[in-house]
Amino acid sequence: MPTGVHLRDARQQLFDAAERVLLRDGPNALTSRAVTDEAGCAKGVLHRHFADFDAFLVDLVLDQAAQIETRASALRASAGTGTVAGNLTSALATLFGPVPMAILPLITFRDELRARLRRARPGGGMAILAEATTAISAYLADERDRGRIAADADVDSLTLSLVGGGHLLFTDDFTADDPGPPAVGTFVTAVIADAVRRRPG
């Protein structure tokens, strides 16, 4: 007698199930059985779509990285509107949302996953952080070109500070409430204060 339910879009439903397990139980609880149990499907479904569990995790990470790239487009589109600090505050809350923050420990602690990600794409070993870095760097360069931050602002250093500090702000416990706009906004404002103060005219 068959076990589980039929999945119409099996890959996406397995990804969704994995994200729920990560958010509820943390990265140590993420196993192939936990994913298929959460999805309510037979245990063999995952292995019909992926060579092994690490192959599943690679596609899960790359799917999340692609979503971050989409959000990055919205950040770049905001250049020249609102405030630089406000745009970056919103972006950090999105780029380091609960799911990306739950996935990052998988990349950090699973050597095989990291190795496969490197093979799958350049810089893939640090997927998600790499996409966040690219997004923020491109946005800051756009704002510098528009004269909203100093012409000699060191975009690379600002980006590293924002990504590194933003990551730490959201790392404490990704299953708990996020640090909230005030804390993130205060951090962002402090990082970019000099570059904004010295902007042209």
Roles of regions detected by a PLM:
Residues 62-69:
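Short, basic, alpha-helical segments at the C-terminal edge of helix-turn-helix-like DNA-binding modules
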Residues 90, 130, 134, 138-146, ...:
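C-terminal peripheral helix-coil segments that are non-catalytic and often amphipathic
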Residues 39-50:
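Short hydrophobic/aromatic patch on the recognition helix
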Residues 69, 97-106, 115-146, 155-160:
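Amphipathic alpha-helical packing segments from all-alpha helical-bundle domains
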Residues 59, 72-102, 158-159, 185:
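Hydrophobic alpha-helical connector segments
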Residues 1-38, 54-58, 79:
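Basic, helix-initiating cap at the start of DNA-binding domains
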Residues 77, 89-100, 106-116, 189-196:
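Helix-loop "lid/cap" segments that line or gate small-molecule binding pockets
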